[in-house]
Every structure is written in C-alpha cells, then in structure tokens.
Amino acid sequence: MAKISKRRQAFEAKVDRQKLYAIEDALALVKECASAKFNESIDVAVQLGIDAKKSDQVVRGSVVLPAGTGKSVRVAVFAQGEKAEQARAAGAEIVGMEDLAEQIKAGQMDFDIVIASPDTMRIVGTLGQILGPRGLMPNPKVGTVTPDVATAVKNAKAGQVQFRVDKAGIIHATIGRASFEATALRSNLSALIEALQKAKPATSKGVYLRKIALSSTMGVGVRVDQATLAAQ
C-alpha cells in the first residue's frame, strides 16, 4: 500500500467525509487544502440520479462559467470565407479547412477545443478516430458545431466548459483555480448546477442531483449541502 503523505493526512483530518458542509465552509476547506506549489484546479463531482446505460439518460452539454476557468484556451476552427474571418476576429488561433485536417492527421494539434461550421462536417467527419478519443470532436450538443462560429469562439475564450456524465452517472468538471475568490467559485458552481438542471432527461425519476462534492487537484473531497446553494 502506498504511503500516505503527511500533507494528505492533514487534509483527511480536517474533512469529515460523512458531513454535508455549507457551500461557504466547503469552499473554504477546499481552498485551504489547496496548498500545493502550483495553482490547483478546483473540481466538482456531481452524482446524478440517472441510468447512464440508457441512451435517453445521457447528460451532456456546456456552460460558460461567469468567472472563467483561469485557463487560457487555444481554439481551432473549421470554417471558410466570411465565417473564417469571423472566427479569426473572435480570437481563434487556428482557422482552416482541408489544410487544418491535414495538420491534425499529421499529429499537429496545438489547441484545446475544436469548433466547426456545419458545412465543414464532411471534412471534420473524417477526423473522428483522431479527435474523438481526445474529447475534441465537435458536437452540436455542446455548441461546437454551429453556424455562429464567432460566438462559439468567444464562449470558449470566456470560460466555457463541457460536461458529460460518465458510466457511473457522475459529472466531473473544473470550476476554477485555488487562487479564485470563494464568491467566483460559488458563481461558477451555480452556473454549472443550473446547466445540469436544464439538461435533466425527461425519463429521469426520483432525486436528480444526488451528491455534490468539491476538491482541489491534490486535496480530498468535501461534500456540499445542496440546500445552501440556493441561499445567496
């Protein structure tokens, strides 16, 4: 068994795994535990009351976090003509068509997100085996296949995050950095929860948001009392 570091032991001692913490206390604990030598991510795990094995209960979407993610994002866009110019004006680092596809096939993928105009999917569709496993394949469900490429680029730059439920029925997302003020993290968490509520499958029965836990990159999970999320 791997030896538990003193730092980890200190975190474990501070957090009661069975307790539901008010959002203010949960954020304070998570930020306190984020004492690594780098600006740790603040992550959230949301257990949903769905059956992830059923295709009609797959929860997927995107949301622009009001306080951003604290990360700079490089955007590649498949577009031509006027839409290509609009994408560049919006801040896209890479814009192209067949030339961009060839770069990707050659392993040149210096970007974090791919956006595509619908008329380019004949090209993008050939890249599924490359982009898909990396989570980069454009999809209309998360707003990355759209005729309004300029807005999609701006959203990506502004702090848009994509979410998709895993096989265990859990959504994992980053809502900021340890350097963020607690109010900013709370605002981002509220935006994500609202987006998840809107994405609730019609066939989902019972309690939808079952558990919410926050953690930093090197910290431990802190469960959140959902009743305190509604209080401003």
Curated annotation (Swiss-Prot):
Signal peptide: none annotated. GO terms for biological process: regulation of translation; translation. One of its GO terms (cellular component) is cytosolic large ribosomal subunit. InterPro entries: Ribosom_uL1_bac-type, Ribosomal_uL1, Ribosomal_uL1-like, Ribosomal_uL1/biogenesis, Ribosomal_uL1_3-a/b-sand, Ribosomal_uL1_CS. Disulfide bonds: none annotated. One of its GO terms (molecular function) is tRNA binding. Belongs to the universal ribosomal protein uL1 family. Part of the 50S ribosomal subunit. NCBIfam families: rplA_bact. Binds directly to 23S rRNA. The L1 stalk is quite mobile in the ribosome, and is involved in E site tRNA release. This is Large ribosomal subunit protein uL1. It comes from Burkholderia vietnamiensis (strain G4 / LMG 22486).
